[in-house]
């Protein structure tokens, strides 16, 4: 390929490096628990060789969770997950996108509609009869982990707060989950960053488009991610670091929007991707430069820690694990399990819930066997899945650092 090839062409071109070694199929968490999915190689690179005259995706691709493990383990650099994501989108374009998928792909819209009546909406989500109705009418599994709506968004809290004047500045990309479901995490993130001498700017920001992309709505996903990048790009061009607490949303801006949505030429997205850090990655960099405060109090806790699938796509290792090792008294149990099964909106769907739970069972067993009072994970949907399956409160690593710094818990 010449220098004018698009990233999508490079992704598709990578399939020629596939030697059918089946390493991706061995690592695939979905293929391990259901015979209905033949594995990422068969559904993607292998069948791609026989497709002519346009896309003809295999229907089994609907069971692919999009976790990205196949791309990570491929020894030849084949973009297996990205090829399969493009094929899933083509399949949705041919067959149509169900109403259920259109709804779960827009969590911010649902949250804004529910916010004025959040107590009532949350009571309905907790009612068995209402969840049974959702399952029958929309196909959202009655036991799927659905987070409660926040009565006030994180952005609303930020607007009423007086920022601290500190010598250095960062920008916080909080994502939809923090804004609409976990504003408490956003508040703790700000306080940890400020405790380390950083002024935190929180510009208005929308959805990154990842749920839309995952559900085959690529046109809408492009509009969303371009809008978000336009909001953040002025800060990136001025040299400010942008830190994120959502592993998957950050990966969308760093790589997936370019490789799957074909936005490699978007100047705003390029600028943002070059200045974007996972929050634990950023704090670990501060520590390595001797700039992270280490006035950490003991936290006497046994804490299983699970690194989410999307973190591998960042290529940053496990920075949260290294940060947690700084906390006195904390006994971290590192998970070697690949996936919790939820994969964003995948595991909430009626036909995929049991597959998602089966994928995550080794992780759930590890956490239950640890007898822990809490667990930790960087990704929001993974936290909700782990807490749902085990009954163990599951925290973002920032929440542990917040406690270790002796900062007052948000009301």
Segments (PLM) and residue ranges:
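Cysteine-centered iron-sulfur cluster-binding motifs in ferredoxin-type domains/subunits
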Residues: 12-31, 56-78, 111, 309-310, ...
């Amino acid at each position: 390929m010449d220098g004018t090839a698009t990233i999508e062409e490079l992704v598709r071109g990578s399939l020629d490096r596939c030697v059918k070694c089946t390493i991706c199929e061995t690592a695939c968490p979905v293929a391990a628990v259901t015979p209905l999915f033949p594995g990422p190689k068969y559904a993607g690179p292998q069948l791609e060789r026989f497709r002519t005259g346009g896309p003809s995706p295999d229907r089994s691709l609907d069971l692919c969770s999009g976790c990205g493990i196949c791309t990570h383990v491929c020894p030849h650099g084949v973009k297996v997950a990205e090829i399969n994501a493009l094929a899933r989108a083509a399949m949705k374009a041919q067959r149509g996108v169900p109403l259920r998928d259109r709804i779960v792909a827009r969590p911010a819209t649902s949250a804004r509609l529910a916010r004025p009546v959040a107590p009532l909406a949350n009571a309905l989500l907790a009612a068995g009869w209402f969840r049974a109705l959702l399952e029958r009418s929309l196909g959202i599994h009655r036991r799927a982990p659905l987070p409660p709506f926040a009565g006030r968004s994180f952005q609303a809290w930020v607007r009423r707060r007086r920022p601290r004047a500190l010598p250095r500045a960062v920008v916080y990309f909080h994502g939809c989950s923090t804004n609409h479901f976990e504003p408490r995490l956003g508040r703790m993130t700000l306080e940890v960053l400020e405790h380390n001498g950083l002024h935190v700017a929180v510009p208005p920001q929308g959805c990154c488009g990842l749920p839309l992309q995952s559900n085959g709505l690529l046109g809408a996903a492009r509009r969303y991610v371009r809008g978000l990048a336009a909001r953040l790009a002025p800060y990136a061009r001025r040299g400010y670091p942008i830190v994120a607490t959502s592993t998957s949303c950050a990966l969308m801006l760093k790589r997936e929007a370019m490789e799957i949505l074909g936005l490699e030429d978007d100047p705003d997205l390029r600028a943002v991707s070059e200045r974007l850090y996972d929050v634990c990655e950023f704090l670990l960099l501060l520590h390595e430069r001797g700039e992270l405060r280490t006035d950490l109090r003991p936290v006497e806790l046994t804490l299983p820690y699970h690194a989410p699938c999307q973190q591998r796509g960042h290529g940053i290792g496990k920075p949260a694990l290294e940060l947690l090792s700084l906390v006195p008294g904390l006994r971290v149990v590192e998970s070697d399990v690949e996936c919790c099964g939820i994969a964003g909106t995948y595991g909430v769907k009626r036909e995929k819930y049991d597959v998602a739970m089966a994928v995550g069972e080794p992780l759930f067993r590890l956490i239950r066997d640890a007898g822990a009072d809490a667990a930790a994970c960087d990704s929001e949907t993974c936290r909700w899945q782990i807490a749902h399956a085990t009954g163990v409160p599951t925290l973002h690593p920032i929440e542990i650092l917040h406690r270790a710094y002796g900062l007052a818990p948000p009301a």
